[in-house]
């Protein structure tokens, strides 16, 4: 009879991953999780290697999915340029989303209209910190990753991925500081937020082409077909479904994405532009395919 031996390993340990907590902000620290190709050394010393980088906001919810997506691809395409994942999140253990995200991921605004809660009443949130958060990523996180963690790696394309408020943040970064990243992956962006004030930024970006002449960014928009047209869930009451329908109709996810795509396409301001609708996916379920599709989109740009 075979005797099997079970030896404990460090809880949650996985190859070629590391994490840091970043202190210095009065509202609380951040956490970054980083992964790199399995063909590199465990220390991340990859002298002479080149790589793309994808930065994720809401990092607690997205880091492992992005890492696994890339590792599956890399196992089949070993000669392809590798990708480093940098997930910016929060040191939390009881959820994958932090309340701090509403401040960090929403643009500053002169007049604020609170979003509605599930009962239809206004639900004010902390908001308007997107500029500060973008500066933190560009001036604190990115230099740490490129100069301290991977000083011998030559980085090529850099991408920013965000979903929902994170998608809104990606659009804000594109429209206000387009040279921050090469590729913007905006999944289910909350264009509806604050009476669609992000569209003012979009039109300023389009009309101010001369101000951003050195930036030739790429944008991929994505959303689920059931975001604007929800399907009733089996355990959902008539009242709950009607509330969800009303909210979906007001937020116009599908129409907003398609209209923004058309406006940007006509402007010719982007090096490449794509919109992708994922059939039978809602706002929550679309995260996986949108993230995977965004990573494939980035990888194919470099293929």
UniProtKB/Swiss-Prot annotation:
Recorded catalytic activity of this chain's protein: enterobactin + 3 H2O = 3 N-(2,3-dihydroxybenzoyl)-L-serine + 2 H(+)
EC class (word): hydrolase
EC number(s) on file: 3.1.-.-
Annotated InterPro entries: AB_hydrolase_fold (IPR029058), Esterase-like (IPR000801), Siderophore_Hydrolase_D (IPR052558)
GO terms of molecular function: hydrolase activity, acting on ester bonds
Any Pfam family matching the protein: Esterase
Keywords carried by this UniProt record: Hydrolase
Superkingdom to which the source organism belongs: Eukaryota
PANTHER family, sorted: SIDEROPHORE TRIACETYLFUSARININE C ESTERASE, SIDEROPHORE-DEGRADING ESTERASE (EUROFUNG)
Family under the similarity heading: Belongs to the esterase D family.
Function: Displays specific enterobactin (ENB) esterase activity required for intracellular release of iron. Enterobactin is a xenosiderophore that is selectively produced by Gram-negative Enterobacteriaceae. The affinity for enterobactin is quite high, potentially due to the low natural abundance of this xenosiderophore in fungal habitats. Does not hydrolyze triacetylfusarinine C (TAFC).
Domain notes: Contains a proline-rich insertion between residues 112 and 122 that forms a kinked, partly disordered turn that decreases the diameter of the active site, making it too narrow for the extended, flat TAFC, while the compact, cylindric enterobactin is still able to enter.
Quaternary structure, from the entry: Homodimer.
Protein name: Siderophore enterobactin esterase
The organism of origin for this protein: Emericella nidulans (strain FGSC A4 / ATCC 38163 / CBS 112.46 / NRRL 194 / M139) (Aspergillus nidulans)
Gene: estA
């Amino acid at each position: 009879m075979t005797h099997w031996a079970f030896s404990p390993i460090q809880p949650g340990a996985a190859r070629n991953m590391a994490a840091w907590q970043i202190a210095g902000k009065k509202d609380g620290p951040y956490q970054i999780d980083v992964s790199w190709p399995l063909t590199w050394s465990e220390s991340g010393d990859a002298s002479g290697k080149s790589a793309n980088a994808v930065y994720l906001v809401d990092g607690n919810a997205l880091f492992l999915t992005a890492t696994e997506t890339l590792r599956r691809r890399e196992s089949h395409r070993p000669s392809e340029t590798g990708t480093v994942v940098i997930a910016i999140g929060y040191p939390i253990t009881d959820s994958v989303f932090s309340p701090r995200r509403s401040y960090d991921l929403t643009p500053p605004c002169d007049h604020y209209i609170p979003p509605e809660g599930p009962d239809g009443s206004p639900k004010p949130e902390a908001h308007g910190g997107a500029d500060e958060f973008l500066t933190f990523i560009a001036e604190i996180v990115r230099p740490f990753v490129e100069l301290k963690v991977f000083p011998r790696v030559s980085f090529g394309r850099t991408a920013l991925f965000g979903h929902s408020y994170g998608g809104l943040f990606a659009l804000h970064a594109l429209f206000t500081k387009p040279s921050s990243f090469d590729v913007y992956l905006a999944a289910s962006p909350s264009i509806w937020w604050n009476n669609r004030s992000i569209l003012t930024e979009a039109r300023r970006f389009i009309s101010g082409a001369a101000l951003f002449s050195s930036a030739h960014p790429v944008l991929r928009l994505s959303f689920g077909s059931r975001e604007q047209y929800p399907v009733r869930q089996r355990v959902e009451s008539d009242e709950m479904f009607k509330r969800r329908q009303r909210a979906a109709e007001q937020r116009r996810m599908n129409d907003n994405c398609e209209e923004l795509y058309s406006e940007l396409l006509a402007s010719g301001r982007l090096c490449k532009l794509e919109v992708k609708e994922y059939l039978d996916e809602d706002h929550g379920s679309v995260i996986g395919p949108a993230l995977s599709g965004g990573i494939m989109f980035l990888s194919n740009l470099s293929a």
